[in-house]
């Protein structure tokens, strides 16, 4: 009998990849939030698709009946109750294993003074839900995506010949979305006993200057890295993007814990779980980035 896997957020950019990678190796039940999401999940290969409102927990448990695992993938700015309702419904239905897509921001928020940024706070709350409800689970904490140029504020900067970050003298280890999805798919298809919390990164640490240089090579034109602080980065955002001051402060709060860490670590978790090395940033750009993408909405 094949595995039965229930995936929330199966219509998003990671969820669809997970469905495609699993294919007919398991019976996928996709939970999506709209008719458009239904079409995307079906096209990605989900065997069953249900349009549900995760804010309304009534009736969710029956969708998890007989499932071997639940995978929760929701937008970083979603309210904690959405994942909590899905996880509690899965546990109530007797599902024994959970995989959660979290964020490295949780790692960086641990031990930092003050309140964590909203994304770290939400993921931290839902990680606690996973740990409370399941004896077997895997939590994956990817760092920044290699698709940095898809972030509106990065795209706006690149279109103006700049790659702005709260600090110039720092680094990232960007990870390709395909590698995140491949790790999640492998964890679902071959669940291990016990619990795992995995930090996911790309294969190399790149300085902000190096990242800008790779974009410059892809664009065929210079990309400047302005010398900013978290405070002046807020001013940069309000000047170079449509963000309000409040939105800019929120964005700076999310990025600053990463910017304060000068040397981004590299993890071998992707290769350990999937059996292959993660994609290099330059290879990701060659396959996925073009100058024309900066003018596309």
Task: Annotate the PLM regions.
Residues 51-52:
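Cofactor-binding loops of NAD(P)H-dependent oxidoreductases
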Residues 214-260, 297:
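Terminal hydrophobic/aromatic helix or amphipathic segment near a protein terminus
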Residues 64, 68-71, 99:
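N-terminal Rossmann-like NAD(P) cofactor-binding module of classical short-chain dehydrogenase/reductase
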Residues 269, 274-297:
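Amphipathic terminal alpha-helices
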């Amino acid at each position: 009998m094949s595995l039965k896997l229930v995936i929330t957020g199966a219509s998003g950019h990671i969820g669809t990849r997970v469905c495609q990678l699993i294919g007919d190796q398991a019976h996928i039940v996709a939970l999506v939030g709209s008719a458009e999401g239904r079409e995307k999940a079906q096209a990605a290969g989900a065997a069953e698709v249900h349009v549900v409102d995760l804010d309304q927990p009534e009736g969710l448990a029956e969708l998890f009946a007989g499932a071997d695992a639940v995978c929760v993938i929701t937008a970083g700015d979603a309210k904690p109750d959405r994942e909590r309702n899905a996880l509690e419904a899965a546990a109530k239905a007797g599902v024994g294993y959970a995989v959660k897509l979290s964020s490295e921001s949780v790692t960086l928020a641990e031990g930092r003074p003050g309140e964590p940024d909203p994304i770290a706070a939400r993921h931290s709350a839902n990680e606690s839900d996973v740990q409370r409800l399941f004896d077997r689970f895997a939590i994956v904490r990817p760092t920044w995506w290699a698709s940095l140029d898809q972030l509106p504020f990065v795209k706006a900067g690149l279109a103006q010949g700049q790659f702005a970050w709260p600090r110039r003298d720092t680094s990232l280890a960007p990870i390709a979305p395909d590698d995140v999805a491949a790790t999640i798919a492998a964890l679902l298809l071959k669940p291990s006993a016990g619990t795992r919390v995995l930090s996911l990164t790309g294969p190399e640490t790149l300085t902000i200057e190096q990242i800008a240089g790779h974009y410059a090579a892809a664009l065929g034109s210079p990309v400047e890295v302005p010398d900013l602080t978290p405070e002046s980065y807020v001013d940069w955002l309000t000047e170079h993007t449509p963000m309000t001051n409040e939105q800019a402060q929120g964005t700076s709060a999310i990025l600053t814990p990463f910017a304060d860490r000068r040397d981004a670590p590299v993890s071998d978790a992707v290769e350990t779980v999937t059996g292959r090395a993660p994609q290099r940033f330059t290879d990701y750009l060659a396959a996925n980035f073009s100058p024309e993408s900066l003018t596309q909405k």
